[in-house]
Design a protein with these regions (language model features):
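Canonical helix-turn-helix DNA-binding module
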Residues: 45-74, 78
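A general structural signal marking secondary-structure boundaries and capping sites
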Residues: 37, 67, 103-107
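Recognition helices and adjacent regulatory flanks at domain boundaries
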Residues: 1-10, 20-24, 46-47, 100-102, ...
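Basic, amphipathic "hinge/linker" alpha-helix immediately C-terminal to the N-terminal HTH DNA-binding motif
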Residues: 22, 75-99
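N-terminal helix-turn-helix DNA-binding core of bacterial DNA-binding proteins
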Residues: 12-55
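Short, contiguous, well-ordered secondary-structure segments
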Residues: 1-3, 7-8, 17-20, 32-33, ...
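C-terminal regulatory/oligomerization modules of transcriptional regulators
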Residues: 94-139
Length: 139
């Protein structure tokens, strides 16, 4: 039995994926990390999304437990935890892109020009991951 088995309601792949990322806050935290380079509890707490501290703490622990993020203390700051997306977490980039595009066309236009003017989703996907990795590589 894997650690993820307790999250799943049934054997349906879509339902299983939603059991992991389908709550109100998980993809918000991933989006904050991926697109806005948020890394600390304080940065997440101060975001426009207004995530309650208890919910944020729970989501960060869950994301770490299932391998979407890792928690580290930086050499120059041993007091603050920094959170980084793993390859598994980065694999949600296409989901974030699709949700943003769907919202742009059906609910609310996005103010991110990269997303609003996307011509090639795969190219955008790779650019977002490269930007994330380049911003976190120096830490």
């Amino acid at each position: 039995m894997s650690i993820l088995d307790k999250f799943f309601r049934c054997n349906c792949p879509v339902t299983s994926a939603l059991d992991i990322v389908g709550d109100k806050w998980t993809l918000v935290v991933i989006k904050l990390m991926l697109l806005e380079q948020k890394k600390t509890f304080k940065e997440f707490s101060e975001s426009d999304e207004s995530i309650a501290p208890s919910i944020l703490s729970n989501r960060l622990k869950t994301l770490e437990k299932i391998g979407f993020i890792v928690k580290q203390k930086l050499p120059d700051n041993q007091k603050t935890n920094h959170y980084f997306l793993t390859e598994k977490g980065l694999s949600l980039t296409p989901v974030i892109i699709e949700l943003a595009l769907w919202s742009h066309h059906n609910i609310k236009p996005v103010d991110n020009q990269d997303l609003a003017n996307v011509k090639d989703k795969n190219e955008l996907h790779l650019a977002i991951i490269e930007r994330y990795k380049s911003k976190t590589a120096t830490l």
